[in-house]
């Protein structure tokens, strides 16, 4: 998935006519060098495009209006090279609907002690020009991010890159369509929620489809297409004897391929990039979609089990955010615990639907085995473990008056023992700061049993996302202390009731 190829971030320099044409010429020349240098050397995921210098309120308003209407523009990066009186920005910022990053930098890294004169001081005023811009952002309660550092500094590059990834994810969220095949698992609470409220908050829409609509597309898949996809399976995975040619469950594999092709065509035809299924709504399907869901997630689709549309949307959004990074991102569920003094572990999995982007094995096992849930034929699935490394679990829940995101940092470990009788993909981790604290905090905060598990993204990505979406964020990591966490829950309740808008 390369979601960033056609996207742009507009690099905007603010100044004013006060300084005269020569100073403005130098500002433009320096800006061109900075943008060229960042595009060539900073390893940014999205291309920077230098826009004409803005010097008046009308120019700023026109630029912000253009940014709103350009689909490939995902945000503005501003640099106050000189002093740009911030009242000029009120009109533009009032209508800006794209993410905004203020890059508090300057062209020169060091002060030229021997040669610095007032001309130099006039030209290089970021130190106070940036503060003026920051004031109007704060005064307008304008949600924006700030990166401070020289434009050739690698730490600044990394932070800008993360902001770009999240800005691209925000753009995806605004246009995302989620398809629900069937309904939510009956009597489950956390997978419910306000879909209208979610569309207002995040931008994505959620549409329900009956199983008959899906099965009509599945049934229309040709045998030739099924056989071609099975050939791909045989080249990509280790097939068990049961699903090899003439194996006892070979037909189950063919049925799984048909479901995958039908689901993908349905999603493509409707412009959907995330979807849900429910084992209680399988009318017309021969098996619970397992392999199909795994492979569609690998191709970038978001997914949520049991009708969990919030997790499906979050998975798609995080996959866009993580595009091109090492490590995978998957639908996940805390399934069972290993309570052992000094070695408390969580086994994460699901009935079938874990994304192969987090697989340790180059060729996962492909099998079809019994699954009592759903009451259908033995479903095909990929079986694998997950490599060790820093990871996170994220969940978005509907609190009635707001959306809350929880993030728990975890340390994934190599599978400590064989699991010869467990026919599903899995990840095994140590929760931060400990299993008892992490689980208690998660439960107190109402975190869902479904999560998005990622070894590609880190906490800063998720903080930025929560800030840009203006939603509550609760973090559980090695710094978490339960009494402080409980205090934060109480304070947040008051804050969001007083400050909701």
From Swiss-Prot:
UniProt-listed Pfam families:
AraA_central, AraA_N, Arabinose_Iso_C
Record keywords: Iron included? no
User: What terms describe the molecular function in GO for this protein?
Assistant: L-arabinose isomerase activity; manganese ion binding
Cross-referenced Gene3D superfamilies, in alphabetical order?
3.40.50.10940
Reaction(s) catalysed by this chain, per the record, are: beta-L-arabinopyranose = L-ribulose
Q: What is any one of the record's Gene Ontology cellular component terms? A: cytosol
**Residues that bind Mn(2+), according to the entry?**
306, 333, 350, 450
The pathway entry for this protein reads as: Carbohydrate degradation; L-arabinose degradation via L-ribulose; D-xylulose 5-phosphate from L-arabinose (bacterial route): step 1/3
Query: Per the annotation, how and in what number is the cofactor bound?
Result: Binds 1 Mn(2+) ion per subunit.
Q: Which cofactors must be present for this protein to function? A: Mn(2+)
EC assignment: the record states 5.3.1.4
Report quaternary structure and partners: Homohexamer.
| Role description | Catalyzes the conversion of L-arabinose to L-ribulose.
The entry assigns this protein to a family as follows: Belongs to the arabinose isomerase family.
Protein name according to UniProt: L-arabinose isomerase
From which organism does this entry originate?
A: Pectobacterium carotovorum subsp. carotovorum (strain PC1)
Ranked from the top, the taxonomy reads: Bacteria, Pseudomonadati, Pseudomonadota, Gammaproteobacteria, Enterobacterales
Tell me the gene name. Answer: araA
